């Protein structure tokens, strides 16, 4: 698919284009309105398409929990290895369309690697994530930024004292969730490891507050997010933050999302996942 089409869809889903402007630009690139509408299913997510770990996988215990946040209870999907052993914990933060089956599936994938994983719903203060993705996107724009960060920081504290964890907590997130993962790293001294996928970078003056080790995944074609890398790296080095950065050439924003035909980049996604699990193993299991 033409990368320009993927780029304007990214601008639309991140709030830089309204739907009318997006469809106008898409029609111009596609060669007409009919062709534009024919492309929409390829651009959107099909969460049922890419389920890898079923909810009833016998190796896991799954369900939903609530933990206290700054705005009240936050609902989260939970998955953990079956058994009585205590394991490290990982927070999985969704993209800018709320908590969906894909992110819950990612949490189960994490759990199968020996972690207790929770995927909080950022839209809990607004009644939870609706099924309609456009409505979910609109609700995400209504969230208060500071309160939302506090709700995810509260997840660190919840997991640190959870009776089924070792008290060691990591965090990972995608797109919007990647940026939120960076904010959790800035605001939680108890976080040990953070893995933002193509996430918006924090302000340089906030970087010295990061105590966690970072594993940074970026997409080579993601001009919008990559524009902030240079300043972020300079701040990380100046503050002596432990980090590794990988650039996945030929991949675009959201390359890990295997529910999106137009965005998923299999080779980049598989390599980033391997590196992520190895990173969490080294930082949370030792």
For the regions a protein language model found, what residue spans apply to each?
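N-terminal export signals
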Residues: 10, 19-44
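Cap/lid segment of the alpha/beta-hydrolase catalytic domain
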Residues: 123-146, 254-260
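Short beta-strand element of the alpha/beta-hydrolase
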Residues: 86-95
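N-terminal cap/lid segment of alpha/beta-hydrolase-fold proteins
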Residues: 49-84
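Short beta-strand/loop motif that positions the catalytic acidic residue
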Residues: 216-218
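Primarily recognizes the serine-hydrolase "nucleophile elbow" in alpha/beta-hydrolase
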Residues: 154-211
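N-terminal secretory signal peptides
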Residues: 1-21
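Alpha/beta-hydrolase active-site loop
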Residues: 138-162
